[in-house]
Amino acid sequence: MKRLVLLSVGALMLAATVFASVAMAQEGTLDITSATLGTGGSVDVSGTIQCTAGAQYFVQVGVRQTTGNRPYNTGSGSYPVFQPATCTGEPEAFTITVFGGKPFKKGTVLVNGFAQVCDTDSCTFPEAPNEEFRLR
C-alpha cells in the first residue's frame, strides 16, 4: 500500500511537470514597444510577439487619444491582415498602422494589444496592457 501511494505521488508530480511545461510552451508573450504619428493622422504601433515555433498567431492593437472635453478618438488594427502568421520561436517584430475616427494628433495616446496564439491543441491569448506613448 505504501509503495502504491509513493508511486501515485511520483506519477502525479511527473505529470504535473510535463503538462505544465507543455502548457507554458505554447503560451506567447506580446510587447508593444513604440507608437509614432504616421501619415494622414495615423498611428504606427510597433512591437514583438514571441511564441513556440510552429504555432499560429494574430495580433490586434487599439489606440485611444483624448480630444479635450470631447469623446475619445479611437482606432484599432491587426497583423497579419488576412491569415495567421507562423511563429519561429524567436521574437517576431510587427508594425500595425491604426486610423482613428478622425486623425490622431501630437500628444499622448493610450495603446493596448492582445494576441491569439494557437497550436494544434489549444489557444492562448497574451495581452499587452494599456501603456502611454507620446506622439511627436
Where on the chain are the PLM-derived regions?
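Intrinsically disordered, low-complexity segments enriched in Ser/Pro/Gly/Ala and basic residues
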Residues: 7, 20, 33, 75-77
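Extracellular and select intracellular beta-sandwich modules with Ser/Thr-enriched
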Residues: 26, 92, 124-130
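Ser/Thr-rich low-complexity repeats and stalk/linker segments
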Residues: 53-120, 131-136
